[in-house]
Amino acid sequence: MQHDHAHRTSIAIIGGGIGGLTAAACLLRAGFDVHVYEQASRLSEVGAGINIGPNASRILHRLGIAEVLRETGVEPQSFDQRRWDNGHILLRSPLGAEVEAAFGAPYYTLHRGDLHRALVDVIPPDRLHLAHRFTQLLDYGDFVESRFENGASVSADALIGADGIHSVVRHALFGPEKPRFTGCVTHRGIVSADRLTHLGLEFRNQIWMGPGQHFVHYFVSAGTLVNFVAVNEEHSWLRESWVDRGEVCDVLVAFRGWHDQVLSIIEAADETYKWALFDRSPLARWSVGRVTLLGDACHPMLPFMGQGAAQAIEDAATLKSCLSKFPSDVVAALSLYERLRLPRASRLQGMSENNKIRFHMPDGQAQKERDAEMASGATDWSWAAIAWL
């Protein structure tokens, strides 16, 4: 339902990724005057998969893209956790129809590009401004001015920094702080499903856990592609870029001795990309006056729960609700947004970090106890265990 404001609250969003675009779509539908400013000269998303649980898919459905998600995504039937060497399934957690029945929305695996395009399509083109690299903010009390490298400047009632882990908006609010290298490097690849028919893969998310490493694979793009993520521990990341072109042979060497299915998926890739995984400690606050942060700009998390994008989507929906509640008091709205979202996102940051420890246990007594605990059901590692989401 749109608000009939005497003065339509204007909002500038810095960053045209999934979080920024979702925020724009939510706020535009609520009647706000929204513009997105993206530093890239064209909108695109890297070729990688993404998990969208029901906590996020229900929000995306309300934006009118349910049909696109069902057509381009995959609804996996389970989440399987396996041993690295023999492929033994330690735990199979149901997804699919069971999750949708329980939570009222589906669990999707998607190509990031498919989701990104779906969001771009629901935002009027005149609301997306490319080649705008944010450089400075000036808060005048009753409005905020954003300045850009190309010489442009814009004024708005509120400024949302959705510009990722290296957020310039965050830097402007809270000063410089380098993200921490976590000691993990991830190799990502996309493989045509046609190359893997001999493996008999099903629509199930698979995570293989091993000493100091783990390997994840699942279908995307209506089942035509298989996305894989291979994570291993490295002592340092010396390159300035946080993402580089990788080499398939390097991934094969890193996962030497792993199950044949893992190696077959890696071998089928034409190329891989290598990400250094960085994080930051949870912030004590996200907002200052008329400016706040969203997504990785304020709560970057390791991709070990599949909740990074989902939490940015939740941020977007909560931001819309808070601004709708206080449309004429932006400062109060952003303060409420922070109070509602910060504890939840910080909790998930910690849970993602803990999963790194659980996934990467060396073979030994602790690993045997973990496996026995999973097999016995003494600890619930299923999606239902995080129904609080």
Which ranges hold each PLM region?
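Acidic/histidine metal-binding catalytic segments
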Residues: 71-72, 127, 256-274, 330-335
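Residues at the starts of beta-strands that form the adenosine-phosphate
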Residues: 10, 33, 225-228
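Tryptophan-rich aromatic "cage" segments
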Residues: 370-389
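Conserved N-terminal helical subregion
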Residues: 2-11, 53-192, 235-254, 384-389
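Conserved N-terminal glycine-rich FAD pyrophosphate-binding loop of Rossmann-like flavoproteins
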Residues: 42-58
